[in-house]
Amino acid sequence: MKIGFIGFGNMAQALAHGLVRGKAVEAGNIGACARDRAKLQRNTEPHGFRAFDDAASVAEFADIVVVAVKPY
């Protein structure tokens, strides 16, 4: 199963790490996109998560998509 996050702030990162620690999903099967590409790469690459440029790419990659953005 592949899980994608639209938005990868503190809550999304906590969920992603918990899924990997709990052995529910392998790190390579987690992908995310966010507004700040540099920050996204800093928060994904060291952990083996995949970084995407946009929400459409995340949706194409994932079986499950989590929308983790603030409701501005």
Q: Where are these predicted regions, by residue range?
A:
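NAD(P)+-binding Rossmann beta1-loop-alpha1 motif at the extreme N-terminus of oxidoreductases
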Residues: 1-56, 60
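Active-site beta-alpha loop architecture of Rossmann-like, nucleotide-cofactor-dependent enzymes
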Residues: 72
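N-terminal Rossmann-like NAD(P) cofactor-binding module of classical short-chain dehydrogenase/reductase
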Residues: 65-66
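Glycine-rich, N-terminal phosphate-binding loop of Rossmann-like dinucleotide-binding domains
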Residues: 69
